[in-house]
């Protein structure tokens, strides 16, 4: 066959397209992924026939599917489909704009070549349409004023050239093309008063009036034709005018030019206005605007925007970040940013803001206003964009901290790629591969295995932490695994979570300042939940799957969510309670814990852990902030790629069933959003002793950042930045002329290759291991850091998730109460962030 890589890529696209055709043929309304695959694969098939042109296929692509053939969200998610195909005259790009633009598609064309039956349009029954638009931006019907408080002048400009001339917003106007004639003296130190990154175009012979405003900041002109190079002052003005005359630049004095200042006055003749909706489309939402997170019912409102309207930094042809404009001159790498993310909406436990993010030496250097201080006000001193600065465009995107999954069974290395593709940048857990022990418990037991696990993950582009086995009632072996590199220990009932083991393990933890994670005794073999709590002796401990379906004292382990020294977490199979949650759990549990259906006691053990009422209570406890962390329990009763999506599914369900939180207004869900994002970012970082390095979008922390389109928030990131470098991203056909043609999928980037993956990441170990210099002994490329400040933690240290209700559980009915109030919600029959987005 002699297949090239691009042909293999297209085979995957074809398979997805044929799958979509099969679903369409049986009357299933397609989701986003299916619709894209069908349209793109059909374009390739028609191109192969060689009978249609690119233009004809661009038109045909708009007719294949209609609104009735796709789920209601799809027309809002799908703006264009691009694919490259082989035509008789070679490889060509086909772009289908607005592919879902009619009520019904031409199904015979959609199924052309598949030999599948064409379904009747009656199969696509009308359904109750959901008017929720994924990722929509909600703005007030009002305008913003640009460049307020600046000196302004209106000048007449005539083009005497024979070709078009286009001038960008931040180009120093005195420096423009010599064939534009106007009063250059009055234009000194001025630029166009138009939206940042837009332009004014002069066709040959055009004569038009333009409004100019003064440059701000240090008021230094650089670049252009260098006729006015230097600070704006009278001396330099005369030198500039001499250069204008001597170099033949068009100049014509305009004595009666209108001059004044821009101001907060709708009638000011110098003002330029932009409607909030247009502003949001160009630069992303601003203060007071709201964004829907994916297809959930959650609305995030921008609390603060660091941008100065009219001086936004945007990159591209004719845009702002160019030499002497948004990009400064004469600032060496030492004082300019390595990378800037422009105009991003940041969703973090600290707040929901809009800002530029500056990255330097792999760290978040600053959050605020970036740009060129020579022409802009408000540029942070450590956020200078220079010739050594890379730009990541954040306009219209959401940035969050990389997620932390702190309940990982290292069963297979492939879970790493699933994790990073979903937005996870830190993994904490234990294991050695698909051994029986690792399938059930998060323990890397021996020092040799600890060394090998640290070495085997050394080049992988995530932060890693490994937990040793803590199930021992004597101390010696625990000291050894901690010195070998364990950053925590795991107590698990499958190894023994008896009071003696608990007490010994916590005693060792106090000595080494590490966290203890516990899966308590479902069997109640050595005692009930109160006996385990007594064994804690008020010492800090992290309780895994604190509801109990994932394991723990039956039926009342959930009581620990009200204990001050306990840091409780959920695992994601029970997030949230849905109509199918109970039915899937029995077999999941039997496989995970090496149980036998033929043994009655094994079945009884399994059934004792699966309780609808306690799972419902878990929903409520997460919503009130009594459960502080959500993690996966990867491949051992948990899904590593769904930590983020299931967190937001829980938030959506709870808002739908209980309404807004008291801390939220009727207009936004900011507090609920901040509470839930803390569950997989800052709180697991605090609980495990590395919040000084990762866990939030804050200055000084590792630049582990995830970028999302609002419409795909919580499902499929646009880009994952690891240690300041792009590590994983949504990229299309590698052979294509541009990066967007299908198949677009999450792919490893340069930040994962060679030595970069390790260099951009951290291996977390104990202080004892760092003192042993395990990084040198093991030959690790990764930065190695010790966890710390764990042993004095309490629930009150869990950000926005510090509630301490008194919890009771009826041992017969399993009903749960908190502070005397029944905790009960119904199961969800549908959840967001699911069928609209995923192929399977």
UniProtKB/Swiss-Prot annotation:
One of its GO terms (cellular component) is urease complex. GO terms for molecular function: nickel cation binding; toxin activity; urease activity. Its EC number is 3.5.1.5. Pathway: Nitrogen metabolism; urea degradation; CO(2) and NH(3) from urea (urease route): step 1/1. Carboxylation allows a single lysine to coordinate two nickel ions. The keyword Hydrolase applies. Binds 2 nickel ions per subunit. The keyword Nuclease does not apply. Was isolated in 1926 by James B. Sumner. It was the first enzyme ever obtained in a crystalline form, demonstrating that enzymes could be proteins. Urea hydrolase involved in nitrogen recycling from ureide, purine, and arginine catabolism. Is known to be highly toxic and lethal when given by intravenous route, producing convulsions and other signs of central nervous system intoxication associated with the high levels of ammonia formed in the blood of mice and rabbits. Is neurotoxic in mammals, when directly injected into hippocampus. This is Urease. It comes from Canavalia ensiformis (Jack bean).
């Amino acid at each position: 066959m002699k297949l090239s890589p691009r042909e293999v890529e297209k085979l995957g696209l074809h398979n997805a397209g044929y799958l979509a055709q099969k679903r369409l043929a049986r009357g299933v309304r397609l989701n986003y992924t299916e619709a894209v695959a069908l349209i793109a694969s059909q374009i390739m098939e028609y191109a192969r026939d060689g009978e249609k042109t690119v233009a004809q296929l661009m038109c045909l692509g708009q007719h294949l599917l209609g609104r009735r053939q796709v789920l209601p969200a799809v027309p809002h998610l799908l703006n264009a489909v691009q694919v490259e195909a082989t035509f008789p005259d070679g490889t060509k790009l086909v772009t289908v704009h607005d592919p879902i633009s009619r009520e019904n598609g031409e199904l015979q064309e959609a199924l052309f070549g598949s030999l599948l039956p064409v379904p009747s349009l009656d199969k696509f029954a009308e359904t109750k349409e959901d008017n929720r638009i994924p990722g929509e931006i909600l703005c007030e019907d009002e305008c913003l004023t640009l460049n307020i408080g600046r000196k302004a002048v209106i000048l007449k400009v005539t083009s005497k050239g024979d070709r078009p001339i286009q001038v960008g917003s931040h180009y120093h106007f005195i420096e423009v093309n010599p064939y534009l004639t106007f009063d250059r003296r009055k234009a000194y130190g001025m630029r166009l008063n138009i939206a940042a990154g837009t332009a004014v175009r002069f066709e040959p012979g055009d004569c038009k009036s333009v409004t100019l405003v003064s440059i701000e900041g240090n008021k230094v002109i650089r670049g252009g034709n260098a006729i006015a190079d230097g600070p704006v002052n009278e001396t330099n003005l005369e030198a500039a005018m001499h250069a204008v005359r001597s170099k033949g630049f068009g100049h014509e004095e305009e004595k009666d030019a209108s001059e004044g200042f821009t101001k907060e006055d709708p009638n000011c003749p110098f003002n330029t206005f932009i409607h909030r909706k247009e502003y949001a489309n160009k630069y992303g939402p601003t203060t007071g605007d709201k964004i829907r997170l994916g297809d959930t019912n959650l609305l995030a409102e921008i609390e603060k925007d660091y941008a100065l309207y009219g001086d936004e930094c945007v990159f591209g042809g004719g845009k702002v970040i160019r030499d002497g404009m948004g990009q400064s001159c004469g600032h060496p790498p030492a004082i300019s940013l390595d990378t800037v993310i422009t105009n991003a909406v940041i969703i973090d436990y600290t707040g929901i803001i809009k800002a530029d993010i500056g990255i330097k030496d792999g760290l978040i250097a600053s959050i605020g206003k970036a740009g060129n201080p020579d022409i802009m006000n408000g540029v942070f001193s450590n956020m200078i964009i220079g010739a050594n600065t890379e730009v990541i465009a954040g306009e219209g995107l959401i940035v969050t901290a990389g997620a932390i999954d702190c309940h990982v069974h290292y069963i297979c290395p492939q879970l790493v790629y699933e994790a990073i593709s979903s937005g996870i940048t830190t993994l904490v857990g234990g294991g050695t591969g698909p051994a029986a022990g690792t399938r059930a418990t998060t323990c890397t037991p021996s020092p040799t295995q600890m060394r090998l696990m640290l070495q085997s993950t050394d080049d992988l582009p995530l932060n890693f932490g490994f937990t040793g086995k803590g199930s021992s009632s004597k101390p010696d072996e625990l000291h050894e695994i901690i010195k070998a590199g364990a950053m925590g220990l795991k107590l698990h009932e499958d190894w023994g979570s008896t009071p003696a083991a608990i007490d010994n393990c916590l005693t060792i933890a106090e000595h080494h300042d590490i966290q203890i994670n516990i899966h308590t005794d479902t069997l109640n073999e050595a005692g009930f939940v109160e006996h385990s709590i007594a064994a804690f002796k008020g010492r800090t401990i992290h309780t895994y799957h604190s509801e109990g379906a994932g394991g723990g004292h039956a039926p009342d382990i959930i009581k620990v969510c009200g204990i001050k020294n306990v840091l409780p977490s959920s695992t994601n199979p029970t997030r949230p309670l849905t109509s199918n949650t109970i039915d899937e759990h029995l077999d999941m549990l039997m496989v995970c814990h090496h149980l036998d259906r033929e043994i009655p006691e094994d079945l009884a053990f399994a059934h004792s852990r699966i309780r609808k009422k306690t799972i419902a209570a878990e929903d409520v406890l997460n919503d009130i902030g009594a459960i502080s962390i959500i993690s996966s329990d990867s491949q051992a009763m948990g899904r590593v790629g769904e930590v983020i999506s299931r967190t937001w599914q829980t938030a959506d369900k709870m808002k739908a069933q209980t309404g807004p939180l008291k801390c939220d207004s009727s207009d936004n869900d900011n507090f609920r959003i901040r509470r839930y994002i803390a569950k997989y970012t800052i709180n697991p970082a605090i609980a495990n002793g590395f919040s000084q390095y990762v866990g939030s979008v804050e200055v000084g922390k590792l630049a582990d950042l995830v970028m999302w389109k609002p419409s795909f928030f919580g499902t499929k990131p646009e880009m994952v930045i690891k240690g300041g470098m792009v590590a994983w991203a949504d990229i299309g056909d590698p052979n294509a002329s541009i990066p967007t043609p299908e198949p677009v999928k999450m792919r490893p980037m340069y930040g994962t290759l060679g030595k970069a993956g390790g260099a951009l990441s951290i291996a977390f170990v104990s202080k004892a291991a760092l003192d042993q210099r395990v990084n040198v002994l093991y030959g690790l490329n990764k930065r190695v850091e010790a966890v710390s400040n764990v042993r004095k933690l309490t629930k009150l240290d869990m950000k926005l998730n510090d509630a301490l209700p008194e919890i009771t559980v009826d041992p017969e009915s399993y009903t749960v109460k908190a502070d005397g109030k029944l905790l009960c919600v119904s199961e969800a029959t549908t959840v967001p962030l699911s069928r609209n987005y995923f192929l399977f």
